[in-house]
């Protein structure tokens, strides 16, 4: 097979192996991803950032029918895009029926409250979008990584030590650019539990307001999170895998070694890049605010300004919001993904050898 890589399998077989790993990983890890997104998206109401509360009330109250403008009447504004807005003309809580949106105090609290108030199925919200995004993206990413690493090492463009870092960064940069719109859709589904119709309205409004570039909202922080993550992950993975392989007999399977090396490398990379994950989540969750309130945002902060604002508002803890679910997700998901991928590659290697030996 002339198109096989040095590992003995073709790019198509690499894509099948990595795609299967993406499906298995998504099924196991989506609940943790949902909890992470919910924890990270907890912040002051988007409405309060767009304009002062007094102006927001005056604009909303002026549009009410006269029958609802009498003293003491309250309005619960909810269009499925933003969190409900509780509006009262005298500034008091004059209605006991209104309950504040659910707040989460931690990972286990989020799990319990999501299941109790929204049902178990909510933990897998956004799974279809996740699969549509992750299967082709992961297949392209892992295949590109292996091909780039072989190319760099084969032509001595970089040392074998740093080839995984360079190949991982380049492969992830291309993948992030292609899947950024689907990442935005998945984040909205998980964070605000929108129906697909509401999500479509939200996306169309954003495109009408900011053009097609709005679909790449969050590309900057996503790239800042994923490209360094990929570089760190593959660099550490190859080092840990090489070290562990030297401790075990060569005739033993490498899948277990890949599982351990992938988990350790994923945990380290996830910790170092978590602040950019928080920025990416908060920026993407804000999609739809303009459509819901019919107002223009005061400004669009850069990634670094958002980092400083989060640090000023919530301290270091805010930059590492969702730390536990991200680490709990990153370690096993990286371990499952890479070990499944290695298992698939081993399977195709054996299959190819048998085909070569068969008459």
Swiss-Prot record:
It is found in: Mitochondrion inner membrane. It is a multi-pass membrane protein. Its main location: mitochondrion. Solcar repeats lie at residues 9-151, 159-243, 253-347. Cleaved and degraded by AFG3L2; degradation by AFG3L2 is regulated by the ability of SLC25A39 to bind iron-sulfur. In absence of mitochondrial glutathione, SLC25A39 binds iron-sulfur, preventing cleavage and degradation by AFG3L2. The presence of mitochondrial glutathione prevents iron-sulfur-binding to SLC25A39, promoting cleavage and degradation by AFG3L2. Residues 1-14, 143-164, 236-255, 339-359 are mitochondrial intermembrane. The chain crosses the membrane at residues 15-35, 122-142, 165-185, 215-235, 256-276, 318-338. It comes from the Eukaryota. The activity of SLC25A39 is regulated by levels of mitochondrial glutathione via its ability to bind [2Fe-2S] iron-sulfur cluster. Upon physiological levels of mitochondrial glutathione, glutathione prevents iron-sulfur-binding to SLC25A39 promoting cleavage and degradation by AFG3L2. Upon depletion of mitochondrial glutathione, SLC25A39 binds iron-sulfur, preventing cleavage and degradation by AFG3L2. One of its GO terms (biological process) is cellular response to iron ion. One of its GO terms (molecular function) is glutathione transmembrane transporter activity. One of its GO terms (cellular component) is mitochondrial inner membrane. InterPro entries: Mitochondrial_sb/sol_carrier, Mt_carrier_dom_sf, Mtm1-like. Pfam families: Mito_carr. Residues 36-121, 186-214, 277-317 are mitochondrial matrix. [2Fe-2S] cluster binds at residues 74, 78, 88, 94. It catalyses: glutathione(in) = glutathione(out). Keywords: 2Fe-2S, Heme biosynthesis, Iron, Iron-sulfur, Membrane, Metal-binding, Mitochondrion, Mitochondrion inner membrane, Repeat, Transmembrane, Transmembrane helix, Transport. SUPFAM superfamilies: Mitochondrial carrier. Belongs to the mitochondrial carrier (TC 2.A.29) family. Mitochondrial transporter required for glutathione import into mitochondria. Glutathione, which plays key roles in oxidative metabolism, is produced exclusively in the cytosol and is imported in many organelles. Mitochondrial glutathione is required for the activity and stability of proteins containing iron-sulfur clusters, as well as erythropoiesis. This is Mitochondrial glutathione transporter SLC25A39. It comes from Bos taurus.
């Amino acid at each position: 097979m002339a198109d096989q890589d040095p590992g003995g399998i073709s790019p198509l077989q690499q894509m099948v192996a990595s795609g299967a790993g993406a499906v298995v990983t998504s099924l196991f890890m989506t609940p943790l991803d949902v909890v992470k997104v919910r924890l990270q998206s907890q912040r002051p109401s988007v409405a309060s950032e767009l304009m002062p509360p007094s102006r927001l009330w005056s604009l909303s109250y002026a549009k009410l029918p006269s029958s609802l403008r009498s003293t003491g009447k309250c309005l619960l504004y909810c269009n499925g895009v933003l969190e409900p807005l509780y509006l009262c003309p005298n500034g008091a809580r004059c209605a006991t029926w209104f309950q504040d949106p659910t707040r989460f105090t931690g990972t286990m609290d989020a799990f319990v409250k999501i299941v109790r108030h929204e049902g178990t199925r909510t933990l897998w919200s956004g799974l279809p979008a996740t699969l549509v995004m992750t299967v082709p993206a992961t297949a392209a990413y892992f295949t590109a990584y292996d091909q780039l690493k072989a190319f760099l090492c084969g032509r001595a463009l970089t040392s074998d030590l740093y080839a995984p870092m360079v190949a991982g960064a380049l492969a992830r940069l291309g993948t992030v650019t292609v899947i950024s719109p689907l990442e935005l859709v998945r984040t909205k589904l998980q964070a605000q539990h929108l129906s697909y119709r509401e999500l479509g309205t939200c996306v169309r409004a954003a495109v009408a307001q900011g053009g097609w570039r709005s679909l790449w909202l969050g590309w900057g922080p996503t790239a800042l999170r994923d490209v360094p993550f990929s570089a760190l992950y593959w660099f550490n993975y190859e080092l840990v895998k090489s070290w562990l392989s030297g401790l075990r007999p060569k005739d033993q399977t490498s899948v277990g070694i890949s599982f351990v090396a992938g988990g350790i490398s994923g945990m380290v990379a996830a910790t170092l890049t978590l602040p950019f994950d928080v920025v990416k989540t908060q920026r993407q969750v804000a999609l739809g605010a303009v459509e819901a309130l019919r107002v223009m945002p005061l400004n669009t902060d850069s990634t670094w300004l958002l980092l400083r604002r989060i640090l000023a508002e919530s301290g270091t803890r805010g930059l590492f919001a969702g730390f536990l679910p991200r680490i709990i997700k990153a370690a096993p998901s990286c371990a499952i993904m890479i070990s499944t991928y290695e298992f698939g590659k081993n399977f195709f290697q054996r299959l190819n050898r048998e085909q070569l030996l068969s008459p």
